[in-house]
From Swiss-Prot:
Protein name, UniProt field: Homeobox-DDT domain protein RLT3
Biased composition (Acidic residues): 587-600
Annotated DNA-binding residue span(s): 2-56
Domain (DDT): residue spans on this chain: 365-424
Major subcellular site: nucleus
GO BP field: flower development; regulation of transcription by RNA polymerase II
Domain of life: Eukaryota
Gene Ontology cellular-component terms listed: nucleus; transcription regulator complex
PANTHER family, per database record: HOMEOBOX-DDT DOMAIN PROTEIN RLT2, HOMEOBOX-DDT DOMAIN PROTEIN RLT3 ISOFORM X1
Region (Disordered): 239-264, 579-609
Amino acid sequence: MKRKSPLQVQALEGFYLEQMYPTPKEMEDLGKSLGLTLKEVRGWFKRRRSRGKGVKSMANDGLGAKNPQLYDRSLMRSSTSSRCVGVAVEERCIVGTRKASCQNLLPSSHILAKVFRKDGPSLGSEFDHLPSGARKASWLGTSSVGQQKQKVARKRKISELMDHTSQDCIQENATVMKHGIGKGLMTVWRVMNPNRRDVSPCVDLLDERATLPQSSARNPPHQKKKQRQLASILKQKLLQKRSTEKKRRSIHREAELNKDETQREFKENCELAADGEVFKETCQTISTLVDDEELEMRERHERGNPLTCSCHHPSSGSHGCFLCKGIAMRSSDSSLLFPDLLPKFPPNSVQMRMPFGLHPWNSSPESVKKLFKVVHFLYTYSVTLDIGPFTLDEFTRAFHDKDSLLLGKIHLSLLKLLLLDVETELERGSFSNLSISCKFLALLQSVESQILILDMWRNSLNSLTWTELLRQILVAAGYGSLKCAVQSEELSKERKLMKKYGLRLGTLKGELFRMLNGQGNNGLKISELADAPEVAVLNLATVPEERENSICSTLASDITLFEKISESTYRVRVNCFSEDPDKSQSDSDDSGSVDDESDDCSISSGDEIEHVSENPALRKVKCRKRRKHKSKMREVCSEIDESHPGEPWLLGLMEGEYSDLSVEEKLDVFVALIDLLSSGSTIRMEDLPRAVADCAPSIYSHGSGGKIKRSSSNQYSYPRGSWVHGGELYGIKALSKSSDSHPVDSSSIVGAFAKLAGNRANNVHPMQSVYLGSDRRFNRYWLFLGTCNANDPGHRCVFFESSEDGHWEVINNKEALRALLSVLDDRGRREARLIESLEKRESFLCQAMLSRQVTQSETAHFTDIVREDSSSPVSDIDNNLCLNEIANDQFSSQHAAIVFEIGSKREKSLLWSLIQEFDDWIWANFNFNLNSVKHRRRSYLDSLTRCKSCHDLYWRDEKHCKICHATFEVDIDLEERYAIHAATCMRKEECDTFPDHKVLSSQLQSLKAAVYAIESAMPEDALIGAWRKSAHRLWAKRLRRSSSVSEITQVIGDFVGAINEEWLWHCSDQGQTLMGEIINCFPSMPQTTSAIALWLVKLDTLIAPYVEKAPPERDQPLCRTRNTSRRASKR
């Protein structure tokens, strides 16, 4: 490799100081500008990094002992604190040849006491001599010819640098005067110019450094040497710190590059995403095929093994059962009629795995069901919720984290949409009971009379208050009150009754049932039903005659629910209200007559339905009593009944933090919130496609066929409802699925995302739930597509939902996928669509499955790693996993489809980065949005901020963190003390991404900073006199020392006691309501960080009018007093 010229070396050195780990593109551009190849530049950077930096590398080369002046000059040249310093050194180098003068070193006692470093060279050792071919410095004897050749080039370069430097100094002058100069430049300039503190730092430093040789005789030699030695030590520490930061940035850049490369694998096209047009064409094509189980029974009958009814016996004397002869085989519900005679499907040859091998997922199928219900909702409505993409394993892992950024952002989006739905329903003025759940209706009734609460919820929602707002919203919906639960049960009776008979709101049959049920035994005429608003909304027909014909045919088609009591009047049969269907009397052959009376029918107690007398006056009296009883119940239910908190997770939110909840309790919170959102107008009015071929169709019974339907429903159970579409989790258990329900996926959002493609160019598609189809047993197959890259489990797994008990399994290898395709029959309606969906994605899935298997085999050792101890650098924000759970999950993790790297270095590094992002999110969405912070009246230095390494709070003018020993700024008056501390106390920072010190809670630290900001924003007349004179200083110290919720509550209580209420009366624009609530509710509010944050937001809103109008203060006596007292305590 050819020798590089001095100019090339100098340019490489300058680029190296700016960026130690350049990208290949940057190295290529640098090589082109210098006339070097990429290989030469890369090799030079490798050798330069291996040699090391700073004093240590110079000592090893033998230059520091030979010429101390060269040592000092090299340090100044390598410093990156200022461009002006580098220019001054360059100008000093081109001055004529001077005789080298040796510098007198500091005495040994000074070195041993203040400068000695443990990692420095051994005292008394001699340095190696320079090799014979080493290149010497120009002023130590280089030829005059070489000097003359370099002078012109150096002069030209220095002149260009001087022009750029002067322009930069002029542009940065205003910023420097406002915020001060950097810590490295400030320290060097003040050390070299102790008597000049009121001049322009940028220009004067350049002039002083350029004329340093001429003015060197003015200062005593010993003082000058001491200042240089001190400046070199300070610059050395700054170089070490900046090099560490550059390493971290380079590691982060490499991670981003790897992430981009991973995303490019699926960037061009994702064949797994849902396609709405293909979905419609497929439904039209397969609608003509025969039902899958009817096809299966025909084949069994042809093979001589026909299915027989389980209750049919040859000894009964009957020569043939119409069910066994195939009359009922024309129904697609044959699997429900003969559940014990049909073989298992899919067979055992299709090997499936459990989704997760981690506790509690591997031992609690119910938790897995709830998890996939939540996942399905989030993936399906990701565009509506406006949440960023995430993978299934990231979401599952977030439940184990103590403070999860992902769960916080998702809850924030869900709450924003829920409040928007509540506001939309309140603006309409009337609550339609068409598709609103009982809990959502209770929430609307609670907020209807208190509009200010809704405004407060919407304006106060942020990253720290969402937990308390979630608790208040769920309590208002009736989850925390016993009487609200009774009310919800009363409101849900009609819904339960409809679900028992397979009716659905929004359909003609369901609305007719609701209207006739409300009229009791009197019923309604067909003309009255046709003119009802509930029927008009369905848009059946424009002509009244056609509407009446549709209603008449619907009522006459099911004689088990409706009976005709006159020529054009229908009512609901009384025996359909029986609690136990088996106890109801069976119909005789003539029970379908329209003249049948209800006297012969057995009825249940009045809890199900109240039979109203035929006397109209008595009926009106009872209706008034019922309405009065309901109105009183609503008033009572608006209060929070803390004696009956209801669900355990609600009590946990009231008495503790969200992070203290268990995994199951966090899931219950999600499910409750999703049940409320499912009834909102945003989700309810989505135009969702219907998978007609995959749903059990309604049994349209005419005439005596109604008896078959009722008798079969009494003997056999309907298939269970899917967790991912329909039914409330709380209050409605074990309900049968509506016969005309349909699976919901993301097919409808494909067009909506195409409109937003310009704003979301980083992802090929949004998060999606893709419904692939169902098999002959109504088992469903799903894809959950998260972030479109190779690390997403949804892009390489097919998720199986059982129709028997609702458990979930995963197909994650191509052998199982092809085995499933081999057992499916494309002649059936449902399996034909499933085959088409799987074959379309087969090659893509198999390739992703195969590549993942190779990756797992290479990194299999990660799954066997267990934490060596329970403590970690992030123990306060670590996950909730314990050693026993991890050890017990070792075996199950190997057989699970999705494996978590518990205890690995990569997992710890990812956890630390998530903690830092969570901390930034808390401060950005809570602290920085406070009016007291945005309109700060006090000095910038008189405010609290946090250390990004350990989250500890410090004042703006502090220099050093006492917990993690991070350096914020170099103190002007204590440079020597800082140098001693840097050499003896400060630990050497490694390039690891997780520290070994204690990490403090981000919530508590942000609360303390917010309290101090609000207290500082209030004027002197807003607080009692004794507070400003003596109590404030002690209160600030107590605030910084507080480390728990109880301690910070006591500190805030002292502050509340010092507030002048009269000032708040005149300050607030919102009057007595908000002011009284803030002052009076503080002692009784829950002792949680979220509740305290909500109280602070209310107080900040109350004083916002004054803070926005008040001018900033010029003098800060409190700041000066605080700084003086703190520095005196340091000494």
